[in-house]
């Protein structure tokens, strides 16, 4: 069973690490990400999410991004979900 942490910073870091692994499995990296969509249960946490996002992406050439506040995610303990669309050249 995966332990879920109750803070958005820890969950965001874990999601970005999961995305990084998925990208690497296809010989891609964050420079290949064209779009990120953030689903948060509390949109006021977006500044924390952005700070962590900026550790993974090229902030001079960031992917298109959207953020959506949702009432809840598939697991009651989740605070954030991130959808990443990458383009392989």
Predicted region positions:
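Short, polar/acidic, helix-capping and beta-turn segments at strand->helix junctions
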Residues: 1-89
């Amino acid at each position: 069973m995966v332990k879920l942490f109750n803070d958005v910073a820890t969950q965001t870091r874990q999601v970005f690490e999961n995305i990084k692994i998925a990208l690497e499995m296809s010989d891609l990296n964050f420079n290949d990400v064209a779009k990120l969509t953030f689903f948060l249960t509390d949109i006021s946490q977006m500044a924390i999410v952005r700070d962590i996002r900026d550790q993974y992406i090229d902030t001079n050439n960031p992917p298109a991004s959207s953020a959506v506040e949702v009432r809840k995610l598939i697991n009651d303990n989740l605070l954030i979900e991130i959808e990443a669309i990458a383009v392989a050249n």
